[in-house]
Amino acid sequence: MEKILVENPNRFVIFPIEHNDIWEYYKMHQAAFWTAEEIDLSGDLRDWENLSENEQYFVKNILSFFAASDGIVNENLAENFYREVQYPEAKFFYGIQLAMENIHSLMYSLLIDTYVSNEDEKNKCFTALDNLPAVQKKAKWALDWIENASFQERLVAFAAVEGIFFSGSFCSIFWLKSRGIMQGLCNANALIFKDENLHCDFAIHLLNNHIENKPSEKRIKEILLSALEIEKEFITESLPVSLIGMNSNLMKQYLEFVVDGLLVKFGCKKQFNVEQPFKFMEQIAVETKGNFFESRTVEYQKAKLNETLSFTDDF
């Protein structure tokens, strides 16, 4: 059995830190903590009403997919990874990841609630797993891996969900950012994008550095490439990016570029050797996050340290 999975009687206490590399991932995530209420959506509704019917359809379904997917990710975290790992540092990371995934889920629900006024239509967005076949297919792939694979292979599949299944959708929203519209959506997208990249990198780091019995390169490629085919179908056929004016062939190339990057991180050879086709993706996420945090008012305090709690208050 992998050492990280062997029962550890000291798993309930974090000190002394024994795995500093894992602890650093936790501290990085802690430093990047944000809340859905920080995102200003006040200007988005005007832009939303100016979108074409096709553009609205695309954004609604992307948000529906994201809202459903975070629930699946959380189930894997809560039901499996958090329970299985015995290093307290890893439990800390999965704990904060679970909290952030909840914030992502709330963010997507707030976005849908803000943009979609028709209650029946809104309900369809909130129940995408029941109503959208394209979302169902991706969900089935993820759930099959969650329920039926070894810990080692689930790390690879989890990286595929975070790194491939979300990548086309993230990219399409950044495309809207490059057009100067939907600022609130784009700010949320930038923050979630960076969170999910960290989650993906953590799964890869665990496999590369804390797992002895790693899946073969052939198996890793099989998992990633099967996820790639589903994502290509989703973002270029089931919910084509052409609806918002993007080039589907370039999106396929972008997804192949993403998969090559993941393969290299896993220590495997590239499969496609393609270039990044979207120049706007190179800096936009970093710039958006920086601008967002710079725009915060100085009065905002995450922990509200300036507030005092009176123990005479009613609870």
Where on the chain are the PLM-derived regions?
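Non-heme di-metal
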Residues: 1-315
